[in-house]
Amino acid sequence: MLSLGTSGVYFAVSDGFKANPQSAVHSFCHALPGSWHLMSVMLSAASSLQWYADNVANTPVAALLDELQQANVDATQAPLFLPYLSGERTPHNNPDAKGVWFGLSHSTTRAALTYSVLEGVSFALAQGAAALHDSGLQPDDINLIGGGARSPYWRQLLADVLQRPLSFRESGEVGPALGAARLAVLAINPQATLDDICPQPPLVSQHQPSAERYAALAPRYQRFIALYQRLADLF
Protein backbone atom coordinates (compact mmCIF):
# COMPACT_ATOMS: atom_id res chain seq x y z
CA MET A 1 0.00 0.00 0.00
CA LEU A 2 1.21 3.49 -0.85
CA SER A 3 -0.07 6.43 1.21
CA LEU A 4 0.20 9.81 -0.48
CA GLY A 5 -0.61 12.12 2.40
CA THR A 6 1.25 14.88 4.24
CA SER A 7 4.09 12.39 4.42
CA GLY A 8 4.48 9.45 2.06
CA VAL A 9 4.46 5.85 3.30
CA TYR A 10 5.02 2.65 1.36
CA PHE A 11 3.59 -0.10 3.56
CA ALA A 12 3.86 -3.88 3.17
CA VAL A 13 2.85 -6.83 5.35
CA SER A 14 4.92 -9.96 5.90
CA ASP A 15 4.37 -13.22 7.78
CA GLY A 16 7.97 -13.05 9.04
CA PHE A 17 10.50 -10.45 10.17
CA LYS A 18 12.35 -8.61 7.38
CA ALA A 19 14.51 -5.53 7.68
CA ASN A 20 16.73 -3.03 5.90
CA PRO A 21 17.85 -0.65 8.67
CA GLN A 22 20.76 0.70 6.62
CA SER A 23 18.22 2.46 4.40
CA ALA A 24 15.92 3.51 7.26
CA VAL A 25 13.16 1.01 6.48
CA HIS A 26 10.86 0.57 9.49
CA SER A 27 10.11 -2.99 10.66
CA PHE A 28 7.42 -3.55 13.31
CA CYS A 29 5.08 -6.17 14.70
CA HIS A 30 1.70 -5.79 13.00
CA ALA A 31 -1.47 -5.25 15.02
CA LEU A 32 -2.71 -8.54 13.55
CA PRO A 33 -1.26 -11.64 15.26
CA GLY A 34 1.52 -13.47 13.46
CA SER A 35 2.22 -10.60 11.06
CA TRP A 36 4.89 -7.95 10.59
CA HIS A 37 4.80 -4.74 8.66
CA LEU A 38 7.50 -2.75 6.91
CA MET A 39 7.36 0.91 5.97
CA SER A 40 9.49 3.22 3.92
CA VAL A 41 8.70 6.80 4.91
CA MET A 42 9.32 10.13 3.21
CA LEU A 43 8.59 13.19 5.33
CA SER A 44 7.15 15.66 2.78
CA ALA A 45 4.90 14.10 0.14
CA ALA A 46 1.61 15.89 -0.57
CA SER A 47 2.78 18.57 1.87
CA SER A 48 5.43 19.51 -0.73
CA LEU A 49 2.64 20.32 -3.16
CA GLN A 50 0.74 22.27 -0.50
CA TRP A 51 3.89 24.24 0.38
CA TYR A 52 4.41 25.09 -3.29
CA ALA A 53 0.76 26.10 -3.74
CA ASP A 54 0.78 28.33 -0.65
CA ASN A 55 4.23 29.92 -0.87
CA VAL A 56 5.26 29.94 -4.53
CA ALA A 57 2.25 29.62 -6.82
CA ASN A 58 -0.20 31.35 -4.44
CA THR A 59 -2.89 29.23 -6.07
CA PRO A 60 -5.09 26.42 -4.71
CA VAL A 61 -3.76 22.91 -5.28
CA ALA A 62 -6.84 21.87 -7.28
CA ALA A 63 -6.36 24.77 -9.72
CA LEU A 64 -2.67 23.91 -10.17
CA LEU A 65 -3.51 20.29 -10.94
CA ASP A 66 -6.19 21.34 -13.45
CA GLU A 67 -3.69 23.67 -15.12
CA LEU A 68 -1.10 20.89 -15.30
CA GLN A 69 -3.60 18.44 -16.77
CA GLN A 70 -4.25 20.85 -19.66
CA ALA A 71 -0.71 22.18 -20.15
CA ASN A 72 1.02 19.28 -21.95
CA VAL A 73 4.29 19.90 -20.11
CA ASP A 74 7.48 18.58 -21.71
CA ALA A 75 8.69 16.58 -18.73
CA THR A 76 12.19 16.22 -20.16
CA GLN A 77 12.67 20.00 -19.86
CA ALA A 78 11.12 20.46 -16.41
CA PRO A 79 13.33 21.28 -13.39
CA LEU A 80 14.18 18.52 -10.94
CA PHE A 81 12.76 18.90 -7.45
CA LEU A 82 14.21 17.35 -4.29
CA PRO A 83 11.24 17.23 -1.86
CA TYR A 84 13.24 17.27 1.36
CA LEU A 85 11.41 20.17 3.03
CA SER A 86 11.54 18.43 6.43
CA GLY A 87 14.75 16.46 5.97
CA GLU A 88 14.34 12.88 4.80
CA ARG A 89 14.03 9.44 6.30
CA THR A 90 13.94 6.49 3.87
CA PRO A 91 16.42 5.89 2.31
CA HIS A 92 18.73 8.75 3.39
CA ASN A 93 17.99 9.10 7.12
CA ASN A 94 19.21 12.69 6.86
CA PRO A 95 17.46 15.32 9.02
CA ASP A 96 19.56 18.05 7.39
CA ALA A 97 18.46 17.38 3.79
CA LYS A 98 16.75 20.36 2.14
CA GLY A 99 14.37 21.00 -0.72
CA VAL A 100 15.97 21.93 -4.04
CA TRP A 101 14.86 23.03 -7.50
CA PHE A 102 17.50 22.32 -10.13
CA GLY A 103 17.34 23.42 -13.75
CA LEU A 104 15.26 26.60 -13.68
CA SER A 105 15.32 28.83 -16.76
CA HIS A 106 13.36 31.69 -18.33
CA SER A 107 11.30 29.08 -20.19
CA THR A 108 10.20 27.33 -16.97
CA THR A 109 6.43 27.71 -16.63
CA ARG A 110 4.26 27.40 -13.56
CA ALA A 111 2.87 24.14 -14.91
CA ALA A 112 6.42 22.81 -15.26
CA LEU A 113 7.10 23.71 -11.62
CA THR A 114 3.92 21.92 -10.57
CA TYR A 115 4.96 18.88 -12.57
CA SER A 116 8.42 18.91 -11.02
CA VAL A 117 6.96 18.78 -7.51
CA LEU A 118 4.76 15.77 -8.35
CA GLU A 119 7.65 14.06 -10.10
CA GLY A 120 10.13 14.73 -7.28
CA VAL A 121 7.78 13.26 -4.69
CA SER A 122 7.18 10.27 -6.97
CA PHE A 123 10.91 9.71 -7.42
CA ALA A 124 11.47 9.89 -3.65
CA LEU A 125 8.69 7.35 -3.10
CA ALA A 126 10.31 5.10 -5.72
CA GLN A 127 13.60 5.24 -3.82
CA GLY A 128 11.80 4.29 -0.63
CA ALA A 129 9.99 1.45 -2.37
CA ALA A 130 13.30 0.11 -3.69
CA ALA A 131 14.75 0.19 -0.16
CA LEU A 132 11.79 -1.81 1.15
CA HIS A 133 12.09 -4.31 -1.71
CA ASP A 134 15.76 -4.77 -0.80
CA SER A 135 14.55 -6.36 2.45
CA GLY A 136 13.32 -9.27 0.34
CA LEU A 137 9.64 -8.32 0.39
CA GLN A 138 8.08 -7.80 -3.04
CA PRO A 139 4.36 -6.85 -2.88
CA ASP A 140 2.36 -7.89 -5.94
CA ASP A 141 -0.52 -5.45 -5.58
CA ILE A 142 -0.25 -1.79 -4.56
CA ASN A 143 -3.27 0.20 -3.39
CA LEU A 144 -2.95 3.97 -3.31
CA ILE A 145 -4.50 5.98 -0.46
CA GLY A 146 -4.28 9.50 0.99
CA GLY A 147 -5.36 12.98 -0.06
CA GLY A 148 -2.82 13.25 -2.87
CA ALA A 149 -4.27 10.09 -4.41
CA ARG A 150 -7.36 12.03 -5.46
CA SER A 151 -5.38 13.30 -8.46
CA PRO A 152 -5.65 10.89 -11.44
CA TYR A 153 -2.63 12.63 -13.00
CA TRP A 154 -0.47 11.94 -9.96
CA ARG A 155 -1.74 8.35 -9.71
CA GLN A 156 -0.67 7.66 -13.29
CA LEU A 157 2.70 9.34 -12.80
CA LEU A 158 3.35 7.14 -9.77
CA ALA A 159 2.44 4.01 -11.73
CA ASP A 160 4.85 5.04 -14.49
CA VAL A 161 7.68 5.83 -12.05
CA LEU A 162 7.21 2.67 -9.96
CA GLN A 163 6.54 0.52 -13.04
CA ARG A 164 3.79 -1.30 -11.18
CA PRO A 165 -0.01 -1.24 -11.46
CA LEU A 166 -1.64 1.01 -8.87
CA SER A 167 -5.21 0.62 -7.64
CA PHE A 168 -7.28 3.46 -6.20
CA ARG A 169 -10.30 2.27 -4.25
CA GLU A 170 -13.47 3.83 -2.88
CA SER A 171 -12.74 6.09 0.12
CA GLY A 172 -9.03 5.77 -0.66
CA GLU A 173 -8.45 9.40 0.29
CA VAL A 174 -9.39 8.49 3.89
CA GLY A 175 -7.77 5.06 3.88
CA PRO A 176 -5.69 5.46 7.08
CA ALA A 177 -8.72 6.43 9.18
CA LEU A 178 -10.74 3.53 7.72
CA GLY A 179 -7.95 1.08 8.53
CA ALA A 180 -7.68 2.32 12.12
CA ALA A 181 -11.44 1.98 12.59
CA ARG A 182 -11.37 -1.57 11.26
CA LEU A 183 -8.57 -2.54 13.65
CA ALA A 184 -10.62 -1.13 16.52
CA VAL A 185 -13.62 -3.26 15.48
CA LEU A 186 -11.41 -6.36 15.37
CA ALA A 187 -10.04 -5.55 18.83
CA ILE A 188 -13.47 -5.35 20.48
CA ASN A 189 -14.88 -8.33 18.53
CA PRO A 190 -12.36 -11.16 19.02
CA GLN A 191 -14.61 -13.64 17.21
CA ALA A 192 -14.75 -11.52 14.05
CA THR A 193 -12.63 -12.58 11.10
CA LEU A 194 -10.42 -10.41 8.96
CA ASP A 195 -12.59 -11.18 5.93
CA ASP A 196 -15.70 -10.04 7.82
CA ILE A 197 -14.32 -6.69 8.97
CA CYS A 198 -11.79 -5.84 6.26
CA PRO A 199 -13.33 -6.45 2.84
CA GLN A 200 -11.49 -4.91 -0.09
CA PRO A 201 -13.18 -1.57 -0.94
CA PRO A 202 -14.61 -1.31 -4.47
CA LEU A 203 -12.11 -0.41 -7.18
CA VAL A 204 -12.43 3.14 -8.55
CA SER A 205 -9.58 3.02 -11.06
CA GLN A 206 -6.45 1.06 -11.86
CA HIS A 207 -3.43 2.68 -13.45
CA GLN A 208 -1.12 0.58 -15.61
CA PRO A 209 2.51 1.66 -16.00
CA SER A 210 3.61 2.92 -19.39
CA ALA A 211 6.96 1.61 -20.64
CA GLU A 212 7.14 4.52 -23.10
CA ARG A 213 6.71 7.14 -20.38
CA TYR A 214 9.13 5.30 -18.12
CA ALA A 215 11.80 5.45 -20.84
CA ALA A 216 11.60 9.26 -20.60
CA LEU A 217 11.44 9.24 -16.79
CA ALA A 218 14.32 6.83 -16.14
CA PRO A 219 17.18 9.25 -17.02
CA ARG A 220 15.56 11.94 -14.88
CA TYR A 221 15.25 9.50 -11.99
CA GLN A 222 18.98 8.76 -12.20
CA ARG A 223 19.75 12.50 -12.24
CA PHE A 224 17.45 12.94 -9.22
CA ILE A 225 19.47 10.33 -7.31
CA ALA A 226 22.78 11.86 -8.41
CA LEU A 227 21.65 15.38 -7.47
CA TYR A 228 21.05 14.39 -3.86
CA GLN A 229 24.37 12.54 -3.69
CA ARG A 230 26.27 15.59 -4.93
CA LEU A 231 24.49 17.99 -2.57
CA ALA A 232 24.36 15.83 0.56
CA ASP A 233 27.57 17.26 2.04
CA LEU A 234 26.35 20.82 1.44
CA PHE A 235 23.10 20.58 3.40
Question: How should these model regions be labeled?
Answer:
Residues 1-145, 150-235:
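Active-site core segments that coordinate phosphate-bearing ligands/cofactors
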